[in-house]
C-alpha cells in the first residue's frame, strides 16, 4: 500500500520517519486509553476471554453496536480471520456481551445494544491489496486501519476501506405455520 509522508515544516523542511511499535501491547494500551477519541468507541475490556481465545479489546460505539479490536504489529499476521472468528463468537454469545455492558456502563446502555451492524477493527502496520479486497467482498463491518508511529509523540491512523455491511438479521429455523397432529397422523408417517 502507499506510504504517507509526514514533514516537519520550520526554517528547514524535514521528513519525519515512521516506524512501528516494538510490542503489540504498546499499541493496544495506547488505543484502549484513548479509544473514544481515536475511534468513537467506549472501551469495555482488554483481553476479553472467550471459550477458544481472547479478543484484544472490546467496546461499544456511539450507535451502541459492539466493536472488536484486533491488533497486529506487522502485516503478515492473520488479523482478519481472527477478527471474523471473534465476531461470529460474539454473535452467538450476545448475553455474555450484554453482561459486560451492564457491568461497565449500566443497564440503560445494555438495553440499547444494536446487534444489526457489529464491527471488527483490525489495526496493523500494513495490509495487502488482497486484504482490502477480501474484506470489501465479505459484506461485514470490518475496518482495516493502518497505523504508523512518528517519533514518540505522533500516531497516525489510515482507514484503508469503507465497509458496506449488510445488517445482521436473526434467522429462525422454526416453522411459523401451525399444524394439528393426531396419533394417527404420526403412525401414518411411520408406515
Where are these regions (language model features)?
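Charged, terminal alpha-helix-loop-beta segments
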Residues: 1-191
